Amino acid sequence: MRCPSCNSLDTQVKDSRPTEDSSVIRRRRVCVTCNFRFTTFERVQLRELTVIKRNGRRVPFDRDKLMRSVQISLRKRSVDPERVEKMVSAIVRELESGGESEVSSEAIGEIVMEHLRDLDDVAYVRFASVYRNFREAKDFEAVLGELSAEDETPRLAPVRK
């Protein structure tokens, strides 16, 4: 692992432990060259994903970019960061287990919107406004109408056997 301070490749792991949900391993490292201490996180990756952009360009999937876009939609919202992390992990897991190594940006956007709808209505509308490229107030009204209609529909409790 390259040291973020001096770019040396000579680093040592001082401590490793799983996170609370055991989906990530947190490693404390120290650079042998400059003694800089830093933390890295290790996640399981089921497969390499390639994103097909709207213009046809193919780019490697970037989990951090997904997290940033979700965090932008959640800005100034009181949502527990752990719930956000779990949601992003669930989205990535869903994409990786989908069976395809290439996924369209539209498909990713729809999955994110589906998860945001369950997490926070305001974040859902914010994300939708960028993802669907809203141009007029009626675009917002349509999405708000979807949310209102969903709220009015009674949800049945799951049947337990």
From Swiss-Prot:
Family matches, as InterPro entries: ATP-cone_dom (IPR005144), NrdR-like_N (IPR055173), RNR_NrdR-like (IPR003796)
Co-factor: note: Binds 1 zinc ion.
Cofactor(s) required for function per UniProt: Zn(2+)
GO biological process per UniProt: negative regulation of DNA-templated transcription
Keywords associated with the record: ATP-binding, DNA-binding, Metal-binding, Nucleotide-binding, Repressor, Transcription, Transcription regulation, Zinc, Zinc-finger
Molecular function GO terms recorded: ATP binding; DNA binding; zinc ion binding
Zinc finger residue ranges, unnamed: 3-34
Residue ranges, annotated region (Disordered): 1-20
Keyword DNA-binding: yes
One Pfam family, short name: Zn_ribbon_NrdR
Keyword Nucleotide-binding among UniProt keywords: yes
Composition skew (Polar residues), residue ranges: 1-11
Domain ATP-cone: 49-139
Source domain of life: Bacteria
Function of the molecule: Negatively regulates transcription of bacterial ribonucleotide reductase nrd genes and operons by binding to NrdR-boxes.
PANTHER family membership: TRANSCRIPTIONAL REPRESSOR NRDR (PTHR30455:SF2)
Family: Belongs to the NrdR family.
NCBIfam families: transcriptional regulator NrdR
UniProt protein name: Transcriptional repressor NrdR
Organism of this sequence: Bradyrhizobium sp. (strain ORS 278)
